[in-house]
Amino acid sequence: ENFNYDIDIQDNRDYQTVFKFEPVDEDAYADIMWPKTHPAVGTPIKLRDYQVEIINSFLENPQCIQEIATGAGKTIMTASLSERVENYGRSIVIVPNKSLVTQTEADYANMQLDVGVFYGDRKEFGHKHTICTWQSLNVLLKNTKNQTVDITIHEFLEDVVAVIVDEVHM
């Protein structure tokens, strides 16, 4: 409205699966202890109230965007969302740079999730969750079009039911 735009978006996709995600509470991951590499080593992973609220909001309305402050624990929330979709398929998490790939991978591993990465020289397939960069996806798309890849973008996205974008503004 501030810029005189009126946008109407309609979702015309025909879903074959009805998603019924189990909501989280603060103790959803309390059976998992933080590892030695985490400042809270040896204590249970517990979600904060606002994290529970945000995660459950995404689970109720999976096609949404939320602005979440720095330091709010976005990566643990992302891992929680990925864990909740596991019964339906794979998740892809897109981050803007390699350091966020490795940080996100570490947090997923802390949550005992089956995680692989796709960027640079590390191209790991066959995992329930994949962390990648925009650049890696763009290269994969370009190479798919040029038929110069071992795996196509279509094969890469097979069984993906959730795409989570971190730092979407970048």
Could you describe each region identified by the protein language model?
Residues E1-D49:
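Helicase-associated low-complexity/disordered flanking segments
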Residues A72-M111, Q135:
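Conserved Walker A/P-loop ATP-binding site and its immediately adjacent core
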Residues G120-T130:
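Conserved motor-coupling elements within RecA-like helicase/translocase cores
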Residues Q66, V93, T130-C132, V163:
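Hydrophobic positions in the central parallel beta-sheet of the AAA+
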Residues E60-N61, N87-Y88, F125-H127, L157-V160:
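Short loop/turn elements that form and flank the Walker-type P-loop nucleotide-binding site
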Residues W134-M170:
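SF2 helicase catalytic motif II
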Residues K46, Y50, E60-V85:
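Walker A/P-loop
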